[in-house]
Amino acid sequence: MKYSTTKIPPAKMNSSADKALVKSPKLRKSQQKPEGVCQMYFMQLRSGLIIEKTSCYFRKEITKRYSPRTAEKCRKQCLVFTACHQQLNKDFTSDVPMLQKCFGRANVPSIQEYSASLSTYNDQSITFVFEDGSYEIYVEDLRKGQEKDKVLFRYYDSQSPSHETGDDVDGQTLLVNLSPTKDKDFLLHANNEEHSVELQKCENQLPDQAFFLLHRKSSECVSFECKNNPGVFIGVKDNHLALIKVGDQTKDSYIEKTIFKLS
């Protein structure tokens, strides 16, 4: 029995193979840039613990050119947004109370003063208006050309360590009181009976209602917890400052109502 085989010349074989291949368009070397990519995965357990996993690899990507000003603006916005939201989500999902802290004396030496503009998480400004011998506090959008009011922060030493909550932001918690920079004798007070925040004149002894625990969520995001009422924060309600109990809020509502920005 005979068998016949058909031999295909190598040149023809290569030619046939080439026809089956689809060549992708080549990019100029100037358009290709090796880029390190890191992906972060998070898994939250029922206990509130968040497990993090990171995987990194390199890829080539067509470069996109931005002006230095645009690139820097995008970078800052991304950093603030990411840092703020990661810490906020961590605080909110914790089953442990956000802060439990003990203090000795109500009046302790001031260690630092800092002046800054205060705005809400939605970029509305906090303004102080003096009317009929007292101040009114408003949360509003600024008119064109209107300057932001400045708030004077006085930082105090707590004299005793904070309660361990498993939240690393506790190590950055400070005791503060707040007043308009143009009238330092008036301080923010927490009115627990009316669930409101008021500016009252203080000359000598400062009551506990005038002290708040400053939680640093990021370089720009902060929140203010009542010293004498743990779990209750300065927040925004009906375009005014009010006292908000975090346990009664959803996560999104908590972020929008109790987080403030410094600038």
UniProtKB/Swiss-Prot annotation:
List the residue(s) that the UniProt entry marks as the site Cleavage. 103-104
Region (Interaction with RELA) residue ranges read 62-103
Does the keyword section mention Cytoplasm? yes
Where is it located?
A: Nucleus; Chromosome; Cytoplasm; Cytoplasmic vesicle, Secretory vesicle
GO cellular component terms, alphabetically, are: chromosome; extracellular space; nucleus; transport vesicle
Q: Which stretches does UniProt call biased (Polar residues)?
A: 1-17
Q: Which organism is it from?
A: Canis lupus familiaris
Task: Give the protein name, as stated in the record.
Answer: Interleukin-33
Lineage, top-rank taxon, reads Eukaryota
Q: What is the lineage of its organism?
A: Eukaryota, Metazoa, Chordata, Craniata, Vertebrata
On assembly, the entry states: Forms a 1:1:1 heterotrimeric complex with its primary high-affinity receptor IL1RL1 and the coreceptor IL1RAP. Interacts with cargo receptor TMED10; the interaction mediates the translocation from the cytoplasm into the ERGIC (endoplasmic reticulum-Golgi intermediate compartment) and thereby secretion.
